[in-house]
Amino acid sequence: MGNRLNLKDLPMGHAAQPPVFNADEYLAWEPAQLDRHEFLDGEVFAMAGAEDRHVTVSMNIAFALRQHLSDSPCRTYMSDMRLQVAAANSYFYPDVLVTCSAHDLASPLVKTEPKLIIEVLSPSTAAYDRGLKFSHYRSLPSLEEFALIDLDTRNTDVYRKGPDGLWVLHPFGRGETVSLASVALELSAVQLFADVLEL
């Protein structure tokens, strides 16, 4: 995901501090804002812009998924699609998500039943994505797989939910093909990092 700012921590003049929100107030307030905001059980976080390679990798993944799933009932969405995690009283904007749910396809503004979520890590959000955010994502009954892509190391960590409900880490190193079992897609490093310059 891109950089994440708690509005309470912004300097004066950058943005007006909103009141304490409940979920309905957040949903009514957010469409009128210039930037996207995530909602975490009453707290609101502004989603700052992401760097070039972050956006490029997200697009590469979404494009590969969209092509792969074109003849299926599944749909791929990027970071402008809001995801509700009801158990955490939260709304997020994942970098990429895939849903195969008829309920989600009928809901134009909010998805609730993703099969796959992918986050591209930023230095300011890596710990949050790996920790608190993943713990909330795991509460989604529909979620089968969660992938984290590290732009600096070019490693990808894929977490898969087993039949016993336990999540197992499947790490993929630099240059390795990433397997997304939930959608039966093998994603090569060339596809994943196309048009991304080495630092």
Kindly label every feature range from the protein language model.
Residues 1-199:
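Gly/Pro/Ser/Thr-rich low-complexity, intrinsically disordered segments predominantly at protein N-termini
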